[in-house]
């Protein structure tokens, strides 16, 4: 139960179901429990990262409820990513130079949850998305702040008033540091503010004797004013990046493009070294001035 990635009700008339969700790359099999929990299927993850579930013959019809968009939906549907614990993002902030390559210039844990999604015309839709985000460390010297771009979700698809209400309710101490922005292509961008460096220290939670404990995980609850396809809310569609203020220098993960300026930057050099790293697990960062390859020796080969 601790590693629950997906829970959903299935139409009793459905014999096979292909789910529009992404599975972390390291997972080879998922386990499907149904009925009273006494029957379990082992389902291999396909090469494209999807799974197909064969619905058992003894499926039971369940009652339905009505959504904000007056759609009938299954009552128990929930999708958690990464399923167990949190994912990790890490950045080096000296792009395009490699710097000390300790990958602790900016470190955060994240997760997300799609609650109450439903099927309509063979597509899967959601009206809510919860993103958990916790800044774990800041070992960089440059003034970067974190952002999350949902490239396939439009700013005008968000119910701003209700979203703001949830931000203030769930994050009373951090709400003013969470801003919802409209990107240059109309896309939805979440702007976050890094925490202050503790008195007497140069960095945040990276020095050997520092006693800083990260603040609790923020709960960013997005409410959509119209249904959004679940395919647009998957991990690969979330562009985590850091950027300087006033639309300055951006640093993205490999394969993602800059938001506010046109370029061919790929954020990877000719030796395949990167400036941003995302892992679907709770990864601990290296302390200051410890090379990442020393902390994680297998990283270079990978």
Model-derived features: where do they sit?
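Extracellular distal adhesion/interaction modules in secreted or cell-surface proteins
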Residues: 1-302
